[in-house]
A protein has these predicted regions:
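A short, N-terminal "cap"/entry segment at the start of jelly-roll beta-barrel domains
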Residues: 1-37, 81-85, 128-149
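Conserved hydrophobic/aromatic beta-strand scaffold that supports enzyme active sites
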Residues: 28-30, 40-44, 61, 84, ...
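Conserved short histidine dyad/triad with adjacent acidic residue
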Residues: 39-56, 77, 87, 96-98
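Solvent-exposed residues in well-ordered beta-strands and their adjoining turns
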Residues: 46-48, 70, 117
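Short glycine/proline-enriched turns and hinge-like loops at secondary-structure junctions
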Residues: 55-57, 105-108
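Glycine- and acidic-residue-biased ligand/ion/polar-headgroup-sensing regions
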Residues: 56-78
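Short acidic-glycine-tyrosine-enriched beta hairpin
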Residues: 75-106
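A short hydrophobic beta-strand segment most commonly corresponding to one strand
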Residues: 94, 107-126
Length: 149
């Protein structure tokens, strides 16, 4: 499978209305989801758009394949920005659970491969958050696996 131009990928697009003060427009395509809690997923950001403010509740690795991914770390207690970084094509990172941040596609968007590992319980992957840090929704392996059957 060529991740850069596979026409068989099933993309799910997420856009939001006026509920957020930043433009949300991204798509994801699940490559593999396994019973052992491993998920491989491609995420594509539209130019200068965000995904939801979120906290990773699973171990995660990512590789930027195209474009730039702008990451802003946030202190969940105060809501203050802790720092910003720009990840470019070829950048790889591995993080333990607990990382809280915003992600935004650069001027030409971004395409990123994520590998998540959540082996326990329902397999909590990511919590989408409101600006105040309260949880809007939780993504789980259990729900993903159920939808794929």
């Amino acid at each position: 499978m060529n991740l850069l131009n596979d026409k068989t990928l099933r993309w799910k697009r997420c856009t939001e209305g006026d509920d957020f003060d930043y433009p949300i427009d991204y798509s994801d395509a699940i490559l593999d989801a396994r019973e052992d809690g491993r998920l491989e997923i491609l995420v594509k950001w539209e130019p200068n758009c965000y995904c939801h403010f979120h906290r990773h509740t699973a171990e995660i690795s990512s590789l930027v394949l195209e474009g730039e991914l702008h990451v802003t770390d946030i202190d969940i207690e105060t809501g203050k920005e802790l720092g910003k970084r720009v990840r470019v094509a070829g950048d790889f990172v591995h993080k333990e659970p607990g990382d809280v941040h915003m992600e935004q596609g650069g001027a030409n968007g971004a395409l990123v491969l994520f590998n998540l590992y959540a082996p326990e319980g329902e397999g909590k992957l990511v919590e989408s958050l409101k600006k105040d840090g309260s949880v809007i929704s939780v993504s789980t392996m259990e729900r993903i696996l159920r939808k794929r059957k």
